[in-house]
Each structure stands twice: as structure tokens, then as C-alpha cells.
Amino acid sequence: MNPPFPGLDGKTAIVTGHKQGIGLAIYSTLTASGCKVRGLDLPEHDLTQLDRIASWVDAIAAETGSIDVLVNNAGITNIGDILETPLSEVDAVLTVNLKAPFMLIKAVLPHMLKQSAGSVINNASDQALIGKRHSAIYGASKAALAQLTKSAALDWGPRGIRFNCIAPGSTATPMLERVLAELHQRYPETYTADCANTYQDATALKRFAQPEEIAQLVAFLASDASSFMTGTILPIDGGYTAQ
């Protein structure tokens, strides 16, 4: 029987934000598929330290012999409209959600170019495709990450490097629990105590995604099964953006 995700055995994958939620599921799924997975996450690897990213990547390449897959999964949220959001919070969100992925891509590209092959998967959000209230800067950061994916795909496709972007909807993770709790606390008239049910009812499948479902899509994009896919933004949201 052919493996579900061909071509991953023995490959080196870097996954950011790998200690919980979607990142942990991605780490586990790629490991189960035969990858040598290396994670970058707090406290050991603070992605706001942009000038250290290249050295982390180079150390992984020296240890494993290659960099074949990069999953830019780490991200932070912010809640608030434009008037409520200080510039310091804008800078924090853009640093983790856009600048760090940019620097990671810049660091892995020389290694991938040596082998004329590589797959980069960026984890955006359904907010890369649609707007949501009280989420202007987070949504803007994810839309920017999606467009970075498209441009990079055009630049580096001729050299054998693929770039794809996933756009998950609400996923059952600790981050989602924190976001829903804060929304209810700050805007109780808009987000009631049972707003989790409202979010689930807004999907065609009437539920949240599970982290493992997102991880399966990432493994597919990392593998040879998606060898003719690049520059895509793939919703995985239970039909939320189909409306």
C-alpha cells in the first residue's frame, strides 16, 4: 500500500509554534509520516528575535543535512477595532505573523535551492479571505501572509520550491478558547456566553475543526502528493467561507 503522504520519509521539516494546538498536530502528523521534524517555539525560540532566525535554521540544516519543508504555523491574535488597537500591538502582530515567516523563508531558501526542491506551507486563517469584526490587524496580517505566499510561489517555482497557504476556520484549540472568552468579556452584547455555538452554527458542518484535520492538509501539501500545487490559498473551514 502506498503511503498517504508520499515522499516525506527522511525529509527534514521545520514547524513553528509546535507545542500546542494546530502546531502540535502538524508536528505529530509529519513525524508519523517519517519526517525529521524540528520545532521552533517559546521559550527556546522567540520568533520576535528576527535576527536569530537564520542561525536557528542553519543549525537545523547542519544537524539533519537538509531543509525540505517549512511550516510557518506560529501566530498571535489581537482583538479590537482600529481605534482600540495601539501601534505597539500592530507591531507585535505583524512581527510574529508576517515578519517572522518572511525571515524563516529567507533563511530556508538557500538550503532548498541547493537541492532544487522544497515545500513551504504558511498557516493563514479564514481571515485572509474574509473580514471579521474586532480583528482588523490580525486579519490584515493573515491576508498579507497569503499574498506573500503567492508572490513567493511565482518567484521560486522555476527553481523547484513550492509555496502554499492554508486558511483554517475556527479550530478547537486553547487559542480559540482564549479568543472567545475575551470577545465575550469585552463585547458581551455581541458575543454571548454561548458564542462558541454561534461560530459552529455558522459553518456548513456545524462544528469546529479539529487540529488533526488541519495537520492532514499540511502533510498533503508537504508531500509529493501535491507536487503540482503552488501559489494556492486553501480554505479548510467547514464551509464557513462558502456563504
Please place each PLM-identified region on the residue numbering.
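Residue(s) in the substrate-gating loop at a strand-loop-helix junction
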Residues: 125
